[in-house]
Amino acid sequence: MEPLKTHTGKAAVLNRINVDTDQIIPKQFLKRIERTGYGRFAFFDWRYLENGEPDPEFELNRKVYEGASILIAGENFGCGSSREHAPWALDDYGFKIIIAPSFADIFHQNCFKNGMLPIRMPYDQWKKLAGQYENQSLNMTVDLENQLIHDSEGKEISFEVDPHWKEMLINGYDEISLTLLLEDDIQQFESKRSSWLQA
């Protein structure tokens, strides 16, 4: 995975609560075996009209949000089934960071595992931030190393992140590469450990 230390990008607001994984990536698109190419199906039922044209009423179709890489989402984002296709779709759409008051736990972990940074933010702080970026074409900088958000007004907002996931993102590790880094330690442990087959 690509390391994520500091990211600057346009922020888009999707102020809807309880957005579930079926709304993020509908089930009819889960038959693919690749991890890429899901971006065009993200939010499909909201994003497109029945004739296949983009729905101008859907928030993320607004011109001001074109090219956004930071999503300011509503409470309980990513609830529903545990499908890993949801973060795949959001990542392929172009989002690298998601800021919300709360996330479904499995979705939250799946974001980290797929190189995305989900940031939990107290509701009052989130409400101010969402209001600032609502219907605006504004950038934001997220500094993961120092755990700071720099908004469009130059204000700093601190955030919490689990040290394990922080290290994974900053170094671009996935679970396999992290295991390989610990290969010597694992082998040393195994060499000292008696086989359960031994009497």
Swiss-Prot record:
Reactions catalysed, semicolon-separated, are: (2R,3S)-3-isopropylmalate = (2S)-2-isopropylmalate
GO MF annotation terms: 3-isopropylmalate dehydratase activity
Against Gene3D superfamilies, the record matches this protein to: Aconitase, domain 4
| Pathways per UniProt | Amino-acid biosynthesis; L-leucine biosynthesis; L-leucine from 3-methyl-2-oxobutanoate: step 2/4
Among Pfam families, the record links this protein to: Aconitase_C (PF00694)
Q: Does the keyword Cell division apply?
A: no
Q: How does it assemble?
A: Heterodimer of LeuC and LeuD.
What task does this protein carry out? Catalyzes the isomerization between 2-isopropylmalate and 3-isopropylmalate, via the formation of 2-isopropylmaleate.
What the record says about family reads:
Belongs to the LeuD family. LeuD type 1 subfamily.
This one is known as 3-isopropylmalate dehydratase small subunit
Q: Which organism is it from?
A: Bacillus velezensis (strain DSM 23117 / BGSC 10A6 / LMG 26770 / FZB42) (Bacillus amyloliquefaciens subsp. plantarum)
Report the gene name.
Answer: leuD
